[in-house]
Amino acid sequence: MKCPFCGSMDTRVLDSRPTLDGTAIRRRRECSSCGKRFTTYERYEEAPVLVVKKDGRREKFDREKIKNGMIKACEKRPVTYEQIEEAVNRICLKLREEGSFEVETKRIGELVMEELKKLDQVAYVRLASVYRDFREVDQFLEIVKELKREKEGEEQ
């Protein structure tokens, strides 16, 4: 595999293991030329799924968009890249299990919100503010109150 740092094709696998959900193989690699290490993920090729946008347009499903959105929401939060990768894998698995060749952006958003709520509540509020298009401070307060109620319900 080509090194992303120096472009050399001389790399070797140091460690290889399945992801927690078993949908991918995570490989830790080292470049023999520059000595830098990097991680790759090997996944099986899936049947194409189309995302139905709010305006009715359709585009090919792109797991990277989900991952990048979650990375942005988790910026400066104690959430690892691996945790985000596993969450994206769970979202993709749920979508596959639903078995549809088309999925609305609303459904993807719901799944992302569920995963973020479990990972980090601050990241959840960040994404909710964009996803639900918050316009007023009261909308932030309401979602924080909702999280507090859920937490109190779990403690009882």
From Swiss-Prot:
One of its GO terms (biological process) is negative regulation of DNA-templated transcription. One of its GO terms (molecular function) is zinc ion binding. InterPro entries: ATP-cone_dom, NrdR-like_N, RNR_NrdR-like. Its cofactor is Zn(2+). Negatively regulates transcription of bacterial ribonucleotide reductase nrd genes and operons by binding to NrdR-boxes. Belongs to the NrdR family. This is Transcriptional repressor NrdR.
